[in-house]
Amino acid sequence: MSELTIFLRHLDEHVLKGTGMGKPAKAKRGIPSKVDDFNAWYPFIVEAAELVDKRYPIKGMDVWRPYGWKAMRQIDALTHSEMDRTGHEEVNFPLLIPEDLLEKENALVARLKRAREEGVDPDELRDEDEEAGFKKEVYWVKHAGENDLDIPMFLRPTSETAMYTMFPLWIRSHKDLPLKVYQMVNTFRYETKQTRSFIRVREIHFFEAHTAHANEEDATRQIEQDLEIVDRLMDKLCLPIIKAKRPVWDTFP
């Protein structure tokens, strides 16, 4: 869920309290115009609202300030409530993932991507050695103290690789299905482009839910429930949304 979407609706009210219902009073308060110069308005309003402080000495890793973190925790509480209501159970996976798991994912992603581009069944193709997935976007841990690690590790950019390593150990028969878990953790991605609070950062306050099902029908029901969850959350946050299905070219392989 985008932190940006959740916060933007409430920023003007918090920062511009007492200025009336009109546009930001640029001359009176020194606030850039959101309409005329969004690129100037956005960082100003994030700082003025005391959501996060971007001056931490690592680019793209902002410090949550009390007001911003309080708002985020309230949003998290709504999410926890929806997960409990729909039978999801909370887990917490390790921050570090061994390199060999990433290699497996990269090979699979490369094969699925090529199958999609060529319009063939992925089973007809062999795994390729080309780099894909998150390999170029992760933070690596290759030393422990003064010793080189036998197997390098990386900070999770997301948790599919870690979770799906454990799922086969937890699911022994159809009686263990459906499996519905979620977690709220920090993830890390080495963004090389210009960072901007909530829009593109290197440390992300991240919510993810993962499920496993006995058949396609049950998986489809889960998708429908997911849409209902989003509707309920956005309604509680007073945020209008448009639900759309991604085209094939824009989906993760």
What are these regions (language model features)?
Residues 2-253:
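TRNA-recognition modules of translation machinery and tRNA-sensing kinases, especially anticodon-binding
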